[in-house]
From Swiss-Prot:
It holds the Pfam family Globin. Red blood cells. Keywords: Acetylation, Heme, Iron, Metal-binding, Oxygen transport, Phosphoprotein, S-nitrosylation, Transport. The gene is HBB. This is Hemoglobin subunit beta. The modification N-acetylvaline is found at V2. SUPFAM superfamilies: Globin-like. Belongs to the globin family. The modification S-nitrosocysteine is found at C94. GO terms for cellular component: blood microparticle; haptoglobin-hemoglobin complex; hemoglobin complex. The lineage of its organism: Eukaryota, Metazoa, Chordata, Craniata, Vertebrata.
Length: 147
């Protein structure tokens, strides 16, 4: 559960309505793989990840980034029940994929950076603070199965 004020929730919802999930999802996942290259081990089937350009232009990275942000969108619609919303994804990433849960926090922080880049002055410190709460809540929910 993420505790947002009414103002924070409105800010998150308003900005998210302007997000191009295809573009932002691919950029966020791509940046995660470039900035934290050890995360690439979970995506060996994606083909060429040999350079930043290869990662950022990889169609499988872009497609999976879109899928990731689709799940994030679901979370935004269920902020009062993030653990329930992400229960199956938590189980998948824990039991089958063996993803280090720290990676969820890293991806959340990268997403915040990408949103700041895309929205500039509109991504005020107050909006960032609200999004930091949301990505922390989502990361916690995704890591729930690990506890």
């Amino acid at each position: 559960m993420v505790h947002l004020t009414g103002e924070e929730k409105a800010a998150v919802t308003a900005l998210w309505g302007k997000v191009n999930v295809d573009e932002v999802g691919g950029e966020a996942l791509g940046r995660l793989l470039v900035v934290y290259p050890w995360t690439q081990r979970f995506f060996e089937s994606f083909g060429d990840l040999s350079s930043p350009d290869a990662v950022m232009n990889n169609p499988k990275v872009k497609a999976h980034g879109k899928k990731v942000l689709g799940a994030f969108s679901d979370g935004l619609a269920h902020l009062d029940n993030l653990k329930g919303t992400f229960a199956q994804l938590s189980e998948l990433h824990c039991d089958k994929l063996h993803v280090d849960p720290e990676n969820f926090r890293l991806l959340g922080n990268v997403l915040v950076c990408v949103l700041a880049h895309h929205f500039g002055k509109e991504f005020t410190p107050q909006v960032q603070a609200a999004y930091q709460k949301v990505v922390a809540g989502v990361a916690n929910a995704l890591a729930h199965k690990y506890h």
